[in-house]
Amino acid sequence: MMKGQIAGLMKQAQQMQENMKKAQEQLALIEVEGVSGAGLVKVVMTCKNDVKRVSIDPSLLAEGEDKDLLEDLIAAAFNDAVRKAEATTQEKMGSLTSGLGGMAGMLPPGFKLPF
């Protein structure tokens, strides 16, 4: 490889690193909502998996309501939020990995980036 090509790759890697840092900061601000029980339970979390709110419809807290059902609905809403956060993260970060250009061929087969 020529000296200029190496310098170009290093500059490209540094720019990508800066872009990834900015994207990760943005992901910490993006909120997704997981829902279960036709909207009776909602979980709002960031794409960095920080739970911000849990909302439970008052009808689920009424006397005689099934505790196990409520627990299942909370778990389902949480899992829904996690899936949405992962999908959003992949979408946002995917544009960065497509910018690898010539560096993509340097990664080992099967190598996965940490996001």
Swiss-Prot record:
Q: Where in the cell is it found?
A: Cytoplasm, Nucleoid
Q: Name one GO molecular function term.
A: DNA binding
Cellular component per GO?
Answer: bacterial nucleoid; cytosol
InterPro entries named in the record? YbaB-like_sf (IPR036894), YbaB/EbfC (IPR004401)
Q: Name one Pfam family in it.
A: YbaB_DNA_bd
Q: Quote the Gene3D superfamilies the UniProt record gives.
A: Nucleoid-associated protein YbaB-like domain
Q: Which UniProt keywords apply?
A: Cytoplasm, DNA-binding
**What NCBIfam families has UniProt attached to this entry?**
DNA_YbaB_EbfC
What binding partners and quaternary form does the record give? Homodimer.
Give the protein family.
Belongs to the YbaB/EbfC family.
Q: Which PANTHER family match?
A: NUCLEOID-ASSOCIATED PROTEIN YBAB
Briefly state the protein's biological role. Answer: Binds to DNA and alters its conformation. May be involved in regulation of gene expression, nucleoid organization and DNA protection.
Q: What is this protein called?
A: Nucleoid-associated protein Rpic_1036
The protein's organism comes out as Ralstonia pickettii (strain 12J)
